[in-house]
């Protein structure tokens, strides 16, 4: 909200760095590990505006067991472990009371404001293809993912999903009105 910039360094130190809007270093938090307040590949994060005040929602991709999301304050204070067992969560995107969480194993999980799983989209039931970035284009299946890596909501509530693949693929999932 004030222009601060946060950067996750999940492939090295597992720190989350905080800079002001001019790029001046302010602080960092986190360290490598598998404990409650440690990261095992802090991969993606977003400003979780489902709460007041907003907080950071961080994807801890390789945390055991099976990946998790955690909340931290904007000052870097641990708030809570949000949910575990998400596979390999790579990023998160918020729209209204919902958050989409791509899982590198080949699916997107939708959580509500209570962080209950509301839907699992595009799940790839083939273990040889879920989490595999080298699926030939002629084997792609519409609406089924191989290794989701990013997602973004548009104003109408449609969800764009980036599937990590050697050729690259973006799918638009159109929101269905009940």
Task: Locate predicted features.
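Short loop/turn segments immediately following the C-termini of beta-strands
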Residues: 10-11, 50, 61-63, 104-105, ...
């Amino acid at each position: 909200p004030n222009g601060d910039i946060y950067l996750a360094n999940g492939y090295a130190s597992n720190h989350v760095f905080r800079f002001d809007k001019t790029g001046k270093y302010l602080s960092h938090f986190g360290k490598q590990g598998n404990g409650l307040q440690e990261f095992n590949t802090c991969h993606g994060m977003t400003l979780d505006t489902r709460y007041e005040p907003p907080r950071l929602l961080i994807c801890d991709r390789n945390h055991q067991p099976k990946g998790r999301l955690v909340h931290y304050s904007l000052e870097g204070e641990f708030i809570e472990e949000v949910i575990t067992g998400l596979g390999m969560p790579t990023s998160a995107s918020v729209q209204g009371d919902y958050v989409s969480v791509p899982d590198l194993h080949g699916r997107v999980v939708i959580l509500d404001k209570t962080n209950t799983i509301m839907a699992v989209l595009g799940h790839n039931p083939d273990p040889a293809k879920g989490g595999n970035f080298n699926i030939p284009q002629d084997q792609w299946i519409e609406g089924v993912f191989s290794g989701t890596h990013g997602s973004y909501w548009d104003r109408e509530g449609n969800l764009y999903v980036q599937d990590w693949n050697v050729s690259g693929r973006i799918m638009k999932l159109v929101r269905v009105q009940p």
